[in-house]
Amino acid sequence: MAIISSRPSGAEGEPAKSRTAPAEPAQRSRTAVQSERAHEDQHEESLRPKNLVDYAGQKDLKAVLGIAVAAAKSRGESLDHLLFYGPPGLGKTSISLILAREMNVQIHLTTAPALERPRDIAGLLVKLRRGDILFIDEIHRLPRLTEEILYPAMEDYRLDITIGKGQNARITSVPLPRFTLIGATTRVGALSSPLRDRFGLIQRLRFYDVEELAGIIVRNAALLNISIDEPGAAEIARRARGTPRIANRLLKRVRDYAQVEGDGRITEPVACAALELFEVDPRGLDWTDRRLLATLIEHYNGGPVGVESLAAATGEDTQTIEEVYEPYLMQIGYLLRTARGRMASPAAYRHLGYAPPQRFEQVSLLDSIDSAHGRN
């Protein structure tokens, strides 16, 4: 399998770097840090599972994709077009790379922001060979003209090119080989219906449970030559927000702490101490998560409040709140999205050390009445 990437640097499909990650410990020399990071980069690709068997978690998704791969191989055809959606960091890119290996085809990686002009997507399409996979991350951000070029490409395997302008314009069709388009998005509802309906298989990636993440951490620790015991892996997993990408990032930061403050081995006490230092609490909330909830409670009496007001008060943009912070806070029951706006749940109050107000039953009743009468 060959991987052909046209991603801009820092694209979402790449492992995310924490904007609030603490600086490297002062005791470690710059040379040591640079050497370690170079070694780490060599292992980055090796952390990705190579096939569906090695891919941890997402049991239902693996079963569906396993059938799709086996059926396509038996018929000698390419995979149908696929759309993966879910919060960032759950493995949408990794599973696409695995599908390319399973089908023994090339995969071309790009992101929607890199396809600003119609000729950008046209240039990728004409390079495809039979069976190739074209992976577009953040596909909900495709420009309208670019999206319209994909319609005949996905449905009829042809590229329609407009030659000339005005009354002299004419359309020339270029045949394309049968290929597979894989789209990845954190906002499936933002896709237009014509584009979404052209995907033959639409699958949601869910958050991972602690056991699944602990298994990923143990596996990746072995690949990175990190000594870790099961309680240590479980502690990191509990604070990883159900996300493998975050689990891998925390593993490396705890590794740093263990090397500087301990004997290099990650145990449960070492993991707890390290993650407290990095301000990741036992539920996986970092400083920004807690600030978001605290702002909701202190400035807006727990809500309900619109996301625009919450964004203005915290200095975050609405898209970041909706795509990065809200999914996990809602998953663990700390944030409620009602017809009236965002609300902090009683569990969020207790987690931050506040006494929950006595109004939740009344608000819940009002929302139920609104819902019954079709009000938004």
Curated annotation (Swiss-Prot):
EC primary class: hydrolase
List of residues binding Mg(2+): T93
Binding residue positions for DNA: R337, R342
Keyword vocabulary terms for this entry: ATP-binding, Cytoplasm, DNA damage, DNA recombination, DNA repair, DNA-binding, Hydrolase, Nucleotide-binding
Binding site for ATP: L47, R48, G89, K92, T93, S94, E155, D156, Y157, R198, Y208, R245
Pfam families assigned to the protein according to its UniProt record, in alphabetical order: AAA_lid_4 (PF17864), RuvB_C (PF05491), RuvB_N (PF05496)
Residue ranges of the region described as Small ATPAse domain (RuvB-S): 209-279
Region (Large ATPase domain (RuvB-L)): 13-208
A GO BP entry: DNA repair
GO molecular function list: ATP binding; ATP hydrolysis activity; four-way junction DNA binding; four-way junction helicase activity
Catalyzed reactions per annotation: ATP + H2O = ADP + phosphate + H(+)
UniProt GO cellular component terms: cytoplasm; Holliday junction resolvase complex
Residues covered by region (Head domain (RuvB-H)): 282-376
Cellular location(s): Cytoplasm
EC nos: 3.6.4.-
Annotated stretches, region: Disordered: 1-51
InterPro entries, A to Z: AAA+_ATPase, AAA_lid_4, DNA_helicase_Holl-junc_RuvB, P-loop_NTPase, RuvB-like_N, RuvB_C, WH-like_DNA-bd_sf, WH_DNA-bd_sf
CDD domains named in the record: AAA (cd00009)
Basic and acidic residues compositional bias, start-end: 36-48
Homology family: Belongs to the RuvB family.
Subunit structure: Homohexamer. Forms an RuvA(8)-RuvB(12)-Holliday junction (HJ) complex. HJ DNA is sandwiched between 2 RuvA tetramers; dsDNA enters through RuvA and exits via RuvB. An RuvB hexamer assembles on each DNA strand where it exits the tetramer. Each RuvB hexamer is contacted by two RuvA subunits (via domain III) on 2 adjacent RuvB subunits; this complex drives branch migration. In the full resolvosome a probable DNA-RuvA(4)-RuvB(12)-RuvC(2) complex forms which resolves the HJ.
Domain notes: Has 3 domains, the large (RuvB-L) and small ATPase (RuvB-S) domains and the C-terminal head (RuvB-H) domain. The head domain binds DNA, while the ATPase domains jointly bind ATP, ADP or are empty depending on the state of the subunit in the translocation cycle. During a single DNA translocation step the structure of each domain remains the same, but their relative positions change.
Function: The RuvA-RuvB-RuvC complex processes Holliday junction (HJ) DNA during genetic recombination and DNA repair, while the RuvA-RuvB complex plays an important role in the rescue of blocked DNA replication forks via replication fork reversal (RFR). RuvA specifically binds to HJ cruciform DNA, conferring on it an open structure. The RuvB hexamer acts as an ATP-dependent pump, pulling dsDNA into and through the RuvAB complex. RuvB forms 2 homohexamers on either side of HJ DNA bound by 1 or 2 RuvA tetramers; 4 subunits per hexamer contact DNA at a time.
Name this protein carries in UniProt: Holliday junction branch migration complex subunit RuvB
Organism: Gloeobacter violaceus (strain ATCC 29082 / PCC 7421)
Organism lineage string: Bacteria, Bacillati, Cyanobacteriota, Cyanophyceae, Gloeobacterales
Gene name of the record: ruvB
